[in-house]
Amino acid sequence: MSDNDKFKEELAKLPEVDPMTKMLVQNIFSKHGVTKDKMKKVSDEEKEMLLNLVKDLQAKSQALIENQKKKKEEAAAQEQKNTKPLSRREQLIEQIRQRRKNDNN
């Protein structure tokens, strides 16, 4: 069995990971010729640092997502404030257009 096959088996034994991440890591390892026996052991301190790094990145990405959602909501609210209400005549015309559109479909 080749080193790559052993490496794939080791990856399969790991807990469920995002398939995209798993594929990217596997491609990077194979690109640089990294095999199981060439890997060094990671100390507990390094493991802790990596875990903290991952948690920090997750928090930053979550904050970015929340920030984007807030910006979209604010933009939508601002757009609603900027649109003037339709007059009764315009409302009726819009209703007729909607009915015609629905009748044609």
UniProtKB/Swiss-Prot annotation:
Swiss-Prot/TrEMBL GO biological process terms: sporulation resulting in formation of a cellular spore
UniProt keyword list: Sporulation
Lineage: superkingdom: Bacteria
Annotated stretches, region: Disordered: 65-105
UniProt name for this protein: Spore coat protein W
Species: Bacillus subtilis (strain 168)
Lineage, opening ranks: Bacteria, Bacillati, Bacillota, Bacilli, Bacillales
Gene for this chain: cotW
